[in-house]
């Protein structure tokens, strides 16, 4: 792990979108707001994303692609980039984690880790 690997901090807030979910059809929509904070000394560009999404039944799906929400943002030192996206699960509980493929101002490629976070309907967990 290089110093660049730890220069990016990822914070996550999740929300269950009840009005667009259909529990009777086993469809649970969640939004997640991601804040990517550049704690390093160089600007860093987010080029790719890789998500691993697991529902309560153990079913796993992967999402890979360029950028996030149609953007490949460059995050200057000591600033943050925030976006909101969503995912649909077949269960009221799930977990997501993954990585962002980043490139530093000097051209060094590295991965920013997105630690596992929970998606859960209100009242499901205490």
Curated annotation (Swiss-Prot):
Tree of life domain: Bacteria
One BP annotation, GO: error-free translesion synthesis
InterPro entries per UniProt: ApaG_domain, ApaG_sf, Uncharacterised_ApaG
Domain ApaG: 2-126
PANTHER family named in the record: F-BOX ONLY PROTEIN 3, POLYMERASE DELTA-INTERACTING PROTEIN 2
This protein's name: Protein ApaG
């Amino acid at each position: 792990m290089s110093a660049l690997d730890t220069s990016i901090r990822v914070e996550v807030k999740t929300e269950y979108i009840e009005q667009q979910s259909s529990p009777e059809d086993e469809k649970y929509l969640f939004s997640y707001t991601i804040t990517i904070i550049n704690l390093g000394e160089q600007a860093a560009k987010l080029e790719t994303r890789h998500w691993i999404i697991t529902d309560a039944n153990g079913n796993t799906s992967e999402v890979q692609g360029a950028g996030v929400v149609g953007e490949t943002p460059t995050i200057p030192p000591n600033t943050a980039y925030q976006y909101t996206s969503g995912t649909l699960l077949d269960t009221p509980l799930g977990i997501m984690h993954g990585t962002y493929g980043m490139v530093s101002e000097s051209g060094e490629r590295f991965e920013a880790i997105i630690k596992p976070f929970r998606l859960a309907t209100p009242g499901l967990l205490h």
